[in-house]
Regions:
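Amphipathic alpha-helical interface surfaces
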Residues: 13, 17, 21, 38-41, ...
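Short microdomains enriched in Cys/His and/or Lys/Arg
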Residues: 46-59, 83-98
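Histidine-centered nuclease catalytic patch
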Residues: 26-61, 71
Length: 143
């Protein structure tokens, strides 16, 4: 099985997730300055193959390479980590969305719109940072 193709929507979504977290790992809080951001990933709890939640803000977070690898290798800890952030009810909804194939078909049809939406969100977040806003910024999800 080949790697999952990274679309322009994936790039825009990743930029939003990482910039909203101030270019820092949301687990260990390591900051990644401009020019050194390759080690900071947009981590998906349910993998990108689940198109229904591929671009769902609650399914993603900014993690450094080390934390991403560690949580990926320890799924029970990853679940606990996400549960502490979102709670049981939100995790149940996320799982239902992950398994909803109609959501996946819709996302595939609207991938260009999704890319545009997250490019605009990235610009909004960038402007908020220029205006002096600090801390995690809420991302307006496409769905």
């Amino acid at each position: 099985m080949g790697a999952i193709k990274r679309t322009p929507a994936d790039k825009a979504f990743s930029d939003c997730i990482r910039s909203a977290a101030e270019w820092s790992c949301e687990r260990c809080h390591t900051y990644y300055p401009e020019g050194g951001r390759m080690g900071l990933h947009c981590s998906h709890y349910h993998g990108r193959g689940k198109w229904g939640i591929r671009f769902c803000v609650e399914n993603a977070e900014s993690l450094c390479y080390g934390c991403h690898q560690y949580l990926g290798a320890h799924p029970y800890l990853h679940t606990d980590h996400k549960m502490n952030i979102h709670g049981q009810a939100a995790m149940d909804i996320l799982r239902e969305k992950a398994n909803d194939t109609s959501l996946g078909r819709m996302a595939k049809r609207e991938v260009k719109f999704i890319a545009k939406h997250y490019r605009e969100e990235f610009k909004r977040i960038h402007q908020l940072r220029l205006d002096g806003v600090i801390g995690k910024i809420e991302i307006n999800s496409w769905s």
